[in-house]
């Protein structure tokens, strides 16, 4: 099961970092993707490295949506509690299917014979095969 978190505002780097860290504490979340418009080239206050669960990540987008793969509906309630705590504005939680779970013909073309090396949890999330 997947959930889209759709805030009614674009998130700052600080809010993105805070949200991802709080979501990272929830059991039942398998993976997350942030989506948004690319930050402009050059200096920008939101172009920085954020730390999520001890891992440094270079933020390259102004976060507009967060897609979360979850194990069950109970996890969705925990996500709602985190969003209520982090967001001082309205947002929507939209259940649906947002992650690919199977390798496609496009993956086979993109990765060639290495397509079998692509871990299931990275299907739809990467353009390179990790050794």
From Swiss-Prot:
Superkingdom field: Archaea
Keywords: Methanogenesis
GO biological process entries: methanogenesis
Pfam families attached to this UniProt entry: MCR_D (PF02505)
Assembly notes: MCR is composed of three subunits: alpha, beta, and gamma. The function of proteins C and D is not known.
Protein name listed in UniProt: Methyl-coenzyme M reductase operon protein D
Originating organism: Methanothermus fervidus
Gene: mcrD
